[in-house]
């Protein structure tokens, strides 16, 4: 067989670029037509009946500087996507008309030309991008989108107040060799609303209250909780073991600390422990004492106190009559620095670190004796007691720290046991109160 030359084996050379261009053009036209698997794409609005109730009254949505979430929450069910293709779902808001609206005599009427259009912002669903199977397995919920009247940051959509908007859901196919492609945009007339900074229609307000009890625009949860706590406090006071206690001890004005429920109980302490058990002893009586520089909640270090302390308290209550308050001028320093039982450490007056007691007052003072103790009593106890016997506010003894070391003596231990505070609030947990 005769050998073939190299030229005969070489493939024929001619230009095929026009063929490649033709194939690319066909692919582009097919992409514009859409994937055959997406021909049956459907998007259905959830909670249609609820949206219709608001739409009938002209729905309103609050916009704030920091952003406010929508109610009703926009949610839609998607069907007809390619389960194996990647999609992103977006939300934006288009102007429903060319009016600025105003609320007059119980109805919304056009109020002039619209303001300039705000910068177009779209909210990308946090699950984007994802497979079509993911978007179709459950409703797509836009509960995290926030409406704002200022352009602040991600997760917020800027709208003009007193303008009507219509939410639009966009589905975009992403990934693969083809470029991003809009599959479809969907909107629903029932979801139209007017952006407001405060609800105008009382009927809309009532619907919001009925179906969304956590809406902040019309229901102040904090005030509601405060009123509930106050009721609990009064109930506890009526069944208190010490009904003779007045507003001087745990005043409602917070002279010795805020209300027991002011701080979030996230520290893990039981609400009934320690001084918090006396949360119901507050009354309407105005506190005669100035508040400390830092308000504290009552301590949870202990649940009860001994018989001696109880007797000491009961015997001292008689000193708190209104006519004895005239002596406050001579005991201002003692009263103002008297610490509250606190669940926070290192909050005891600095004078307690050098003197055995923390401002024990005399019988002429409106403050009862024997309420507080210090874990390091010293020989300066007698000095403080002697000074207060003459109506003077106790002061630090000035002894060096080396001399204040008698905490283990039997005499000091016995003396400290007789001055337990209600709830046994320990000075070791409250050292350094300023």
Swiss-Prot record:
Main location: nucleus
Compositionally biased spans, kind Polar residues: 355-364, 376-385
GO biological process terms held by the UniProt record: cell fate specification; heart morphogenesis; mesoderm formation; positive regulation of DNA-templated transcription
UniProt cross-references to SMART domains, sorted A to Z: TBOX (SM00425)
Recorded GO MF terms: DNA-binding transcription factor activity, RNA polymerase II-specific; RNA polymerase II cis-regulatory region sequence-specific DNA binding
Listed SUPFAM superfamilies: p53-like transcription factors
DNA-binding region: 50-220
UniProt note on tissues of expression: In the developing embryo, expressed in the mesenchyme founder cells, vegetal plate of the mesenchyme blastula, extending tip of the invaginating archenteron and, later, in the secondary mesenchyme cells.
Function according to Swiss-Prot or TrEMBL: Involved in the transcriptional regulation of genes required for mesoderm differentiation.
Protein name stated in the entry: T-box transcription factor T homolog
